[in-house]
Regions:
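Conserved acidic carboxylate
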Residues: 7
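Two-component/phosphorelay signaling modules centered on CheY-like receiver
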Residues: 10-30
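Acidic, metal-coordinating helix/loop segments flanking the phosphotransfer/catalytic sites
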Residues: 31-48
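Active-site residues of response regulator receiver
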Residues: 52-54
Length: 118
């Protein structure tokens, strides 16, 4: 499985990458902290795109807006929202737009890997 992680917090991203790469089922984890067009993301060959809701320094809008644009551009990857914010506040919007999942950043690392491997 190939995963793209879009998050503007480098320390968090690097930690998650190290955890995910310990899984036998995850072959590649690519970190994105800079991009200029949606097509750079949407049309690469990833199984899952993990997107943080708060992308202040990366993108002109929030992660949900970026996720919606990726989905609307016909990306075949599963888009999963990753957040440290209240689930109730954003989960309904994420599901309504077609996101595959919604995960909490404070989740146990083993649980995160299990959910992504489903």
């Amino acid at each position: 499985m190939k995963i793209l992680l879009i998050d503007d917090h480098k320390l968090f991203s690097q930690s998650i990458k190290m955890i995910l790469e310990l899984s036998e089922n995850i072959k590649k984890v690519q970190l994105v902290d800079n991009f200029s067009t949606i097509s750079e993301i949407a049309f690469n060959d990833y199984d899952i795109i993990l997107i943080d809701i708060n992308l202040t320094s990366l993108y002109q809008a929030d992660g949900l807006t970026l996720a919606q644009e990726i989905i609307d551009n016909g990306c075949s990857s599963k888009v999963v929202i990753l957040t440290g914010y209240s689930k109730k506040m954003y989960e309904h919007r994420a599901k309504a737009m077609g996101a595959y999942g919604f995960l909490d950043k404070s989740m146990n690392p083993d649980e995160l890997v299990k959910k992504l491997e489903k």
